[in-house]
């Protein structure tokens, strides 16, 4: 299986035989219902909401909670050793429009990603892929990354980061595009042509989505805890 276009060495010793045997036993005994609901693998690109130049390959493994809401685990690659770097929630336009206006800038659209050919389902025949992407094209997503693999972090360091997606031509780094196209044997240009008929949200892209065209940065600050909250703790970070 192809690996990520951004690779770093993770600290720690190789998994021991005893650990592997224990995992085999627990894997047989226990159920993993939430994970067994994953039905879809989407590959796309994310950039940090405060720095479009920092772009990463993002593999989404998604499950439907219902027809209007999907939840996705995001890995840096499709292989067994891929790192869990974030999560994304995908909602229909109907659900997005119910969100408070203060919340909407944290969400992004998928129309350009889909119609631009840069969001795809590895290994899935085009006819099947396009049937689902017709729906994805109309949705909104909220993405948070915990592991900044693009800067070479060996572990998830620092604050969670709000991520955004491509919204027009010329934003995707060519080296990253070339790497992914070669690795998965896809052509973004060909897919762009195949998806020209698709349409985005029925009411158009909401003006508050995509961070309203501005940058968003996650920050942390120290505040005092209310006296009634706890007797032992005097500080909290938000």
UniProtKB/Swiss-Prot annotation:
Name of the featured protein: Oil body-associated protein 1A
Swiss-Prot/TrEMBL keywords: Lipid droplet, Lipoprotein
Tissues where this protein is expressed: Expressed in seeds, but not in leaves or roots. Highest expression in scutellum. Detected in embryo axis and endosperm.
InterPro entries (alphabetical): OBAP-like
Pfam families: DUF1264
Gene this protein is translated from: OBAP1A
GO cellular component: lipid droplet
Signal peptide: none
Compartments, as annotated in UniProt: Lipid droplet
Family listed: Belongs to the OBAP family.
Keyword check for Repressor: no
Coiled coil: none
Domain of life: Eukaryota
Alphabetized PANTHER family for the sequence: OIL BODY-ASSOCIATED PROTEIN 1B, PTHR31360
Biological classification of the source: Eukaryota, Viridiplantae, Streptophyta, Embryophyta, Tracheophyta
Main location: other
